[in-house]
Each structure stands twice: as structure tokens, then as C-alpha cells.
Amino acid sequence: MGAVRVPLPVRVLPQIAERAWFTPPRPSARARARDALALEGVEPITLTVDGRPRPGFVTGEGPLMVVAHGWGGRAAQMLDLARSAARRGYRAVAIDSPGHNTDDKSTSDGFQMAAGLEAVVASFGPPAGVIAHSLGAIATVMAFRDRPPDVAVWLAPVLDVRESLEIFSHRAKLAPWTARSLKRRVERFIGDWWPALTAGPDADLPGAEILIVHDPADPDSGFDRSAALADRRAKTRLVEAPETGHNLLLRDPNVIDSVERFLDEARVVTNHPGP
């Protein structure tokens, strides 16, 4: 929300704040036009998620790489990273999550984002790897914790919903009682998944080789949690991406190079055939 004027009901009425929390931002018409140009010549797909058609794309041949956008994102944002995976011998698949981009359903949540990833696997088979941005990292934990891929790339990952709630409450200028009520409502909604979605440095895809790429000054997700995870967990690498913020790293050439090097090195470790 940033400097946008926040309507008073959002700030003081918990039920309105809750609706705002579960409503991802939509891309501008200009962004959608850029997406359409970028996707020209890329193989389109449409998958059904909870009875709703969700568009996306597939590129490359080889083991499946599931590509997950973040909150308020869309598949087209991840095209450069999907192509990097394709160059390294993977079949990269991404779709727009439910409630995102052009979907006429206005709300979404981590469960729906995870359902989108599960739909990819249902159509294309088990994943060898995942590439995920922001809240997409938590969605990969929800979708694949019990059947983790061999490799995972997390870009500016959101690893603790509590941090996101704090950022949202601050930017929306929620009244203190509204912020407290919103947290209780979100915790109740998440239910048994609350420990996993607030794990922070203890977040995990068991056994996977993980690369984390993060701007130390990212205003939307805490670099300190990524650093602590990399320090704690074996088979985890952290690459700092200064001055890329929360979204620019998705197209940053240095980030793309880091991802490709990681996929090459991880392929040797996990004994997947090369491209």
C-alpha cells in the first residue's frame, strides 16, 4: 500500500482489514501489455485449479521445474527464471495462482497458491525442482513438504507470515485493535499450518538443495530470516542481491546467472542428467 491513502474502514474494522489482507494487488494494464509481448512464442497452458481455469506457460524439456510467483504476482513475471531453468535442461511450468492477475475471483491465500502448484504436478508429474518468489516460497513448503523436490530456488522468500502481517498493518495504518484482531483471524484461518508458516529460519523442504537469493535491504521480506536459515541449514546457499528490492531480482542478469550456476552444481549433486 505504501503511500496510498488507506480508507478508514480498512484501518478500524477488522473484517474489512481481513478482506484487504486476502486481496492480492492486480497488475496495471501496462504491465499486462508487457506480459503479453513477453509471452509471444511461449507455449501457453491452462490448468484447472479448484474448478477454475488458470493460465500459464511451459518452456523447455526435461525434469519438471515448478515455477511459483509471489503474492500479487503472475506467471509472466517468472519468465526469465523459467527460461534459465529451461537452458539448464528442465521443463519449467508456471501458472497464475487463483485470485491473481486476470482471475475474476478477487481474493486468494497460501492454500490456493499451493493448490495451483499441486495442479501443475498433477498435470506434469513430480517436480525435480522449484523456483519460487516471495510468498511462493511458503506455497512450495505447503505443497511439497511431504514430497520435496531435489532443488529449490527461493527469491526474496517470505518465511514468516507474522512478519508479513506486521508490514501490512504498518502500511495500512491499522489501529492497534484492528491489527491484533487481524492476526487472530489469520491465525484461525491458517489453523494447523500456523507453525510451518511462521517457521522463519526453520522453514524447510527436507533434503532439498536450496538457493536463497535476497536483497539485504528488501522492504517486503526479512533478509535476516534468509541469512539465519542459510546459517542453520545444511545444503543451503545464500546469495545477496543488493539494490534489487523485492521484485527486480526476478529479471536481474546477475541473479539469473547465480540461479543457472546453482542448477548446474545441484544437478551434479543430485545426479540428474545434464541438458
Spans of model-derived segments:
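Conserved alpha/beta-hydrolase
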Residues: A75, A82-D104
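Hydrolase active-site cap/lid region
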Residues: D146-I190
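Alpha/beta-hydrolase active-site loop
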Residues: S106-A128
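Conserved alpha/beta-hydrolase "acid-adjacent" motif
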Residues: P219-R225
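Gly/Ala-rich beta-loop-alpha elbow adjacent to hydrolase catalytic centers
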Residues: I131-T140
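An N-terminal hydrophobic leader/cap segment in hydrolases
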Residues: M1-T48
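Short beta-strand/loop motif that positions the catalytic acidic residue
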Residues: L205-G207, I212-H214, D218
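Catalytic histidine-centered segment of alpha/beta-hydrolase-like enzymes
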Residues: T244-N254
